[in-house]
Each structure stands twice: as structure tokens, then as C-alpha cells.
Design a protein with these regions (language model features):
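Extended, low-hydrophobicity segments enriched in charged/polar residues
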Residues: 1-106
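Serine/threonine-rich low-complexity intrinsically disordered regions
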Residues: 4, 20, 25, 30, ...
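Long, positively charged binding patches that form subdomain-scale interaction surfaces
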Residues: 70-149, 161-162
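C-terminal structured domains
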Residues: 116-248
Length: 248
């Protein structure tokens, strides 16, 4: 079980505040780590993760804040997505994992500054067109290992199948091994917290689940025991052509 974070600054008061549209940023985090003291914090669910909103002064946006500003959560999401696309460069580049699962790629926001109310690295997972363009270029659907908020690894389904053939294993066996690897990282993370409580604030765990991206439908699915977990639902990503001027 991931320990919930408790180091975030509490609001000095509960009064709603004016939201500056040019300062709204998205963050992605495991829902267990999102501060629990204010149930009104706006969270957009994506499996066991939560997308939440912060402003330039690092305040998390709540229900009362969007009501005060007469803005919907949907509009806030659109504003934050488009703002970040304009301000940050996102890349997918070759990488290696510790146990060399397969040929890996890593999502990265090149010029993000976490201290300046920037998005965390993992939120690039939901940027319009990012996974779609990469998947089309690779001619393959994708498997995603959301190791933590800084390291989100991508594997092509084509390469996973190639690994299965080379090692004479079923795809289910390889995917279960990926799930076990992720679980081991979570256990190591929790054990490290026992030794160094600050470690959980450096690179928090993101998800318990391996994800599958279908490029035809532009949707994410969660895996369980090497197969798509139909009970977990799906998360539909925005198409690239949804980007538009919304900051005015």
C-alpha cells in the first residue's frame, strides 16, 4: 500500500480564489498520494491514478474555486492541456529498464521545471497525439509501464511478441512478468520509505497497473494477470486536432 503524501502546504483559509488561466497546470499522481484533507480537490480519474490541477502558486484547484470562477472542469482540462502543449516539449526516446523487459522507450517533458508549477513528467502520457503519433510511427499498439511520476516506459506490442518468440513464452507470461516487475518496484519503494521518509517525495509511485494503448481507438486500458481488465474500464485520450487557442 502506498503511503499517502502529507507534506503539501495546507491552505491558509478555505476561501475560493481567482484562477489565472495562463497559470493552470495538470499533474498526474497515484490517487493514494493525492492529499486527502480536502475532498473537494478536483480529480479526473484514470484507473488508479488521478489528474489534478495546480495554479502558479501551487494551490490545488477545488470545486469551490471553479464555481467561484464560473468555469467547468472540462474547460479547465482543455485550458491546462493546451497551455502545456505550447510551453513544454515532449519526447519519446529509447531507454533501458533494469530487467530489460524488451526494447523500451521513455516519455519525457524536456523543459519542465517542477519548482515553477510545471507538469510532472508522467502527465505527458495524456497529451493529445503523443501516444497516437508514436504508435502509428511504430505500426504497433503499445504497452506502458508507469513506473513512477518521472519514468513512464513504453513498449511496442510488436516487440513484446518478438520477445515471446525469442524466449518461447506466451504473451501472457511476458506481461505477467512486467506486472510482477512493477509490483516489486512498489514494494521496494515502500521499504525505502521505512528507511528514508523523504524518498517518497522524490519519485513517487504512479500506478499499480500496466497499461495497454490501442492506436485504432486512441484509448488506454489497464491489465490484470496479463490480460485487459474489462472491469477497469478505459480512458479515451484527446485527438491531436483538439489542440486550439483557449487561453483568452
Amino acid at each position: 500500500m502506498i503511503r499517502p503524501a502529507d507534506d503539501y502546504d495546507l491552505y491558509e483559509d478555505n476561501k475560493p480564489f481567482s484562477i489565472r488561466k495562463d497559470k493552470v497546470t495538470l499533474r498526474l499522481l497515484n490517487k493514494e498520494l493525492i492529499p486527502p484533507w480536502n475532498p473537494n480537490i478536483i480529480i479526473r480519474n484514470i484507473f488508479d491514478m488521478g489528474i489534478y490541477y495546480v495554479t502558479g502558486d501551487e494551490n490545488m484547484i477545488r470545486e469551490e474555486d471553479i464555481e467561484f470562477n464560473n468555469i467547468s472542469e472540462e474547460k479547465l482540462y482543455e485550458i491546462a492541456i493546451n497551455k502545456m502543449i505550447k510551453e513544454y516539449d515532449i519526447t519519446i526516446s529509447p531507454a533501458e529498464t533494469e530487467n530489460k523487459i524488451a526494447n523500451a522507450f521513455l516519455l519525457n517533458i524536456e523543459n519542465a521545471n517542477e519548482c515553477n508549477s510545471a507538469p510532472n513528467n508522467c502527465v505527458s502520457l495524456i497529451y493529445p497525439g503523443i501516444l497516437k503519433n508514436f504508435a502509428e510511427k511504430q505500426h504497433s499498439n503499445l504497452y506502458i509501464l508507469p513506473l513512477n511520476i518521472e519514468y513512464v516506459y513504453i513498449f511496442t506490442e510488436t516487440d513484446i511478441k518478438r520477445k515471446c518468440k525469442a524466449e518461447n513464452k506466451s504473451k501472457k507470461e511476458v506481461l505477467i512478468a512486467m506486472e510482477e516487475y512493477l509490483q516489486k518496484q512498489i514494494e521496494d519503494y515502500d521499504n525505502k520509505v521505512e528507511i528514508d521518509i523523504l524518498s517518497r517525495y522524490r519519485i513517487p509511485i504512479l500506478s499499480y497497473k500496466i497499461l495497454y494503448y490501442n492506436r485504432t481507438y486512441n484509448e488506454l486500458y489497464a491489465l490484470k494477470n496479463g490480460k485487459i481488465d474489462k472491469t477497469a474500464g478505459k480512458y479515451e485520450l484527446l485527438p491531436e486536432n483538439k489542440q486550439k487557442e483557449v487561453l483568452s
